[in-house]
Amino acid sequence: MHIISGSKKGRKIITPKRNFRPTQSKVREAFFNVLDIENKTILDLCSGSGAIAFEALSRNAKHATMIEIDREAVKTIFINAKEIFADDNSLYKIKRISACDYLKKTNDKFDIIYLDPPYHSKIYYDALNYILKRNILNKDGILAAELGLNHYRGFIKNINDAVSCIMKYDIRIYGDSVLIIFKYV
């Protein structure tokens, strides 16, 4: 896997060795092609390899925070960060904590939040509730959720029933992956 575009284009991104489903290049490309990422802050929840955050930084995001609970994945993120950004760690933060625990505790705010837990995970709704109730997403911010096709319809129905302050901005389907991009209004 490689960074697709920007100042670090072509740089290799390694992935954790076990049971991880990295975001496909075509999903990453679609996500970044619909957004203006320059000078934005990004929160990459369930970061895995850090690919979303590193792609954002390569495209001139102001800062990225990567949240991951898996110890091996966090080690992988640190390796990738060192390889891609040398010792310039002012551009990013890496935290080993669950996404929901981070969202419960943080006082940080972000312009863009990318949520990509394992497809079988149940944290989508809890994470969304924390993000909205705690005002973690800035006004006019973007929330993206990557989920499995078999969870897509239920997720959309529950979101539409529960939340009026976000609107669907874009939906892309790639095989068994669905990328839903919301705008916070």
Segments predicted by a language model, with ranges:
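Class I S-adenosyl-L-methionine-dependent methyltransferase catalytic core
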Residues: 1-185
